[in-house]
Each structure stands twice: as structure tokens, then as C-alpha cells.
């Protein structure tokens, strides 16, 4: 269901201390936006209504967090949820930021100097594999290679989904993009780890009897990347043919 336009969203976000108003202007300097810039930096790609961010960020003041979504009408809900979570603990929201960004173009906003330690991807759009739309998946190698450029060596991606096809495909996506899958499960709640934070979507799918799939993948050396953009591969083949 399409979310309705919220005329109050932009003014309220502009008045929010932890909203990044012009995210394309901070490349290489994101850490400087936080009260404690030397802390590890974790991103949530597609933070939605903020259910996950509102749980994890206040509980870990020793880590800086950034929640990203593409529209203000979604981000305003995350802002309110995060704000309430910090208020409930009586602590300042000084280790969290939210920003409106197109995840497919993160390179426009970040540089390798921004040093991402961990990325969370929770219940992203699974995208149909028809007509090439799977390239928009947040775990597609095309996307993972983009994240690699921003991540520290040994940094991790924590991924959860309800979608069987997306998860099974992702089990091949990550290694192709040079990530080692260090942990995986096809039923997260069967032996639920203590560290798992259930999101709104997670609870909804679980109540419907849909198993939650999850994995943790660690960034490996550049020489472990095997995936090549199809267009680049075609150009390479054309060049080799011309050389012959």
C-alpha cells in the first residue's frame, strides 16, 4: 500500500537534531557529525519506520548509527520512534542520525574514509527476478560491491528476510561479491540468538508462521570478488574479440 504524503514531515525533520539535512555534502566526514566521532559506525539500509534503530542505538551508546531510507514520509516515522526511545531512557540521541538517501547511489554520499564497521539490512524489498529487477535487491552483487568500497576490512553485513527466494539467491550473491558468510539460518526464531532484535515486520511474519532467514557476512579481500557487471563483461569480451 502506498504511503500518503505527509506535509509535516519535512519541517519536522529539519527541526530534528539527529536528522542529516544535506547528506550529499558529508562524504569523508560523516564521523564528525557525532558527539564521539571515534566510535565504530553502523548503518541500517532501509530503516523504514525505525523499529530496529530505536531498539539498537539507545542500547549501544558506544557505537554511532545511521538509519537510511529514501523518503521523508517514511523517515518521519523513524524520527518519532527513535526520539521516543531515547526519551524513555532519559539519554541524549547523540550517537544516532537518520538521512534520506537512495541506497542504490550510496557512493554519492560516502567515501572509503567514512569507515563503515557494520551494515544491517532488515526485510528489504525482495524484488522479482523478472525483467532484470533483481539488480535492485539490496543484497545483489551490484549493490554489495558498492558497500565494499565504504567498509573496513573485516566489516560485516547482517541480513534478515522473510523471502525464501531472496535469501537463497543471497547465499550466492555474498561470496560472489567477496563476502564470507560466517553464520546463517533458515529459521532464526527456532534457536533465537540473544542478540536478535525483533522488528515490526519480523513479528508480523513470525505470527503468520513464516520462518525468518538470516545471515552474517564478513568482507573478504578484494581478490575474492568474482562477480563482474554484465555490461563490463560484454565490453571486455568485445575488446578481446577486437584484439584477435
Question: Which residue ranges define each predicted feature?
Answer:
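S-adenosyl-L-methionine
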Residues: 1-43, 51-60, 80-113
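Conserved SAM/SAH-binding beta-strand->alpha-helix loop
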Residues: 71
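A short glycine-rich, Lys/Arg-flanked "PGG" loop and its adjoining helix->strand segment in the class I
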Residues: 138-153
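Conserved glycine-rich SAM-binding loop
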Residues: 48
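Conserved beta-strand signature within the Rossmann-like core of class I S-adenosyl-L-methionine
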Residues: 154-161
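Conserved beta-strand/loop positions that form the S-adenosyl-L-methionine
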Residues: 43-45, 68
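Class I S-adenosyl-L-methionine
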Residues: 170-244
